[in-house]
């Protein structure tokens, strides 16, 4: 537990201190955000706000993760694990794709970065690499970071994927989550605040998996997860970095995370869900992100098939703005919904464990 607190503290400190430095740097260089040309009129005042704050988030996550491990190793503990490094590697590669996208937007002074093909290729590369490596690095207990068995709160033994199908599954999961967080990042602090809650929930889940791991505490309800404590450190560092960034990103935002941050954070959810064997449970925890990306899909399908739009604008947080909700109302209400979803997800996780142990 001490290492988890250290990861949170370091990540928060790095993020909250580095972000204002980025604000000054990007402002001096004139690297301001361009808004959607068809976006809500109230967003016009956001033009010119520095972007690419995801650099501070990623720096905070890595600092929190590595810093907690330095302390742990000084006390005789283990170093970074394959699972933790795979998740952070996935997030970093996706963040790199987002960084290129952000830079192109800023250079062109338009809200148009990488074309869809280039962006998809970048996400595909990250997902395939993650999927292939997730089935490697078998430890002494025979566990790999990922599992070919589909998982709810633990592996579903009746649904086993061939290695190639598992990699394809990872492509779907990574693409879905990275795009979901990307679409959610449209209001000041919305994505950062929601992400902090989801990863905080994952701290509880993965730490519980660590305390009830089959490798150290075999018995009813134990979990076959390769590196649950390390995943808790990744989740804790992410939560801390998001809170630190939120200090500057809360309405009215002084900086935006950009695709650098949103794609990376989507990678965090995707990576942790796969390596903690909770791919289906993640849909409950990240219900806001799921709803946001679903609204975009529904809007596109409805318009192409009927010529009519379901929402005034998608992602649907903009719909609520256009029907009269203030931006801060949308943000706070969506945060509340995220808190409820995370509470429900943790309750489902714990309830399944109680059932497994016969309580």
Curated annotation (Swiss-Prot):
Membrane association type: Multi-pass membrane protein
Keyword set, alphabetical order: Cell cycle, Cell division, Cell membrane, Cell shape, Cell wall biogenesis/degradation, Magnesium, Membrane, Metal-binding, Peptidoglycan synthesis, Transferase, Transmembrane, Transmembrane helix
Pfam families for the chain: Glycos_transf_4, MraY_sig1
Gene Ontology BP, a term: peptidoglycan biosynthetic process
Disulfide bonds: none
GO cellular component terms, A-Z: plasma membrane
Group of enzyme by EC: transferase
Transmembrane segments: 3-23, 55-75, 80-100, 117-137, 156-176, 187-207, 231-251, 255-275, 280-300, 334-354
Pathway note: Cell wall biogenesis; peptidoglycan biosynthesis
Cofactor(s) this protein cannot do without: Mg(2+)
Reaction catalysed by this enzyme: UDP-N-acetyl-alpha-D-muramoyl-L-alanyl-gamma-D-glutamyl-meso-2,6-diaminopimeloyl-D-alanyl-D-alanine + di-trans,octa-cis-undecaprenyl phosphate = di-trans,octa-cis-undecaprenyl diphospho-N-acetyl-alpha-D-muramoyl-L-alanyl-D-glutamyl-meso-2,6-diaminopimeloyl-D-alanyl-D-alanine + UMP
EC number in record: 2.7.8.13
Subcellular compartments: Cell membrane
PROSITE patterns: MRAY_1 (PS01347), MRAY_2 (PS01348)
Role summary: Catalyzes the initial step of the lipid cycle reactions in the biosynthesis of the cell wall peptidoglycan: transfers peptidoglycan precursor phospho-MurNAc-pentapeptide from UDP-MurNAc-pentapeptide onto the lipid carrier undecaprenyl phosphate, yielding undecaprenyl-pyrophosphoryl-MurNAc-pentapeptide, known as lipid I.
UniProt similarity note: Belongs to the glycosyltransferase 4 family. MraY subfamily.
Protein name: Phospho-N-acetylmuramoyl-pentapeptide-transferase
Record organism: Mycolicibacterium smegmatis (strain ATCC 700084 / mc(2)155)
């Amino acid at each position: 537990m001490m290492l988890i607190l250290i990861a949170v503290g370091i990540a928060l400190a790095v993020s909250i201190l580095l972000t204002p430095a980025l604000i000054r740097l990007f402002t001096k260089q004139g690297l301001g955000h361009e808004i959607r040309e068809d976006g809500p009129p109230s967003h016009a005042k956001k033009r010119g706000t520095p972007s690419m704050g995801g650099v501070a988030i990623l720096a905070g996550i890595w600092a929190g993760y590595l810093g907690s491990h330095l302390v742990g190793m000084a006390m005789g503990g283990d170093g970074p694990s394959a699972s933790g490094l795979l998740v952070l590697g996935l997030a970093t590669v996706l963040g790199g794709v987002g960084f290129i996208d952000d830079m192109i937007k800023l250079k062109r002074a338009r809200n148009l970065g990488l074309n869809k093909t280039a962006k998809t290729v970048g996400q595909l590369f990250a997902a395939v690499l993650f999927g292939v490596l997730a089935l490697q690095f078998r430890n002494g207990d025979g566990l790999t970071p990922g599992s070919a068995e589909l998982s709810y709160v633990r592996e579903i033994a009746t649904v086993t994927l061939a290695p190639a199908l598992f990699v394809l599954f990872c492509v779907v999961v990574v693409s879905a989550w990275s795009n979901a967080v990307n679409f959610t990042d449209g209001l000041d602090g919305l994505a950062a605040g929601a992400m902090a809650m989801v990863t905080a929930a994952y701290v509880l889940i993965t730490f519980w998996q660590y305390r009830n791991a089959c490798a150290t505490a075999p018995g009813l309800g134990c979990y076959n997860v390769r590196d649950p404590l390390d995943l808790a450190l990744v989740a804790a560092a992410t939560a801390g970095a998001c809170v630190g960034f939120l200090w500057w990103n809360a309405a009215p935002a002084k900086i935006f995370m950009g695709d650098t941050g949103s794609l990376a954070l989507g990678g965090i959810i995707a990576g942790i869900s796969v390596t903690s064997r909770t791919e289906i449970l993640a849909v409950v925890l990240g219900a806001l992100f799921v709803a946001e990306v679903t609204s975009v899909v529904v809007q596109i399908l409805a318009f192409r098939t009927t010529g009519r739009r379901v929402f005034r604008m998608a992602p649907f947080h903009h719909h609520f703005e256009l029907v009269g909700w203030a931006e801060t109302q949308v943000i706070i209400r969506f945060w509340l919904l995220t808190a409820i979803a995370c509470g429900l997800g943790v309750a489902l996780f714990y309830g399944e464990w109680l059932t497994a142990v016969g309580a």
